[in-house]
Amino acid sequence: MKNLTLVFGLVVSLFFLSCKENTTAQQIKLISPEEVYDAVRDNQNLQLVDVRTKDEFGEDHLKTAQNICVTDDDFKEKVAKLDKNEPIYVYCRSGKRSSNAAKILKEMGFKEIYDMEGGFLNWESQGLQEKN
């Protein structure tokens, strides 16, 4: 009976340990425009991607952003050139397309993905600088 209790306890423990969230797995973190502003201010070389169309990007964008449109056929090909081991920040107009882009990046193996909550509209409503 003692052995049965011990085995049962071990099985239950292993079950709960296997259910624990893997903290090293890729995660998508929704962050505020202020957090993006701080990241850009602290590191001008960070991977900041505006996933809107070329026309939207041409109207206005964050100063150090590169434009890789998530709806373009070659989106995956272009982002594959970025460093998967470095943090990547994505944004769009309101947050929908960047959320989709973040999911694609996660599937592609990017380790640290930040999605700006509310997109460029939220950035503008906060009155933040660092725009082009």
Identify the role of each PLM range.
Residues 48-50:
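Structural scaffold elements adjacent to functional motifs in cytosolic proteins
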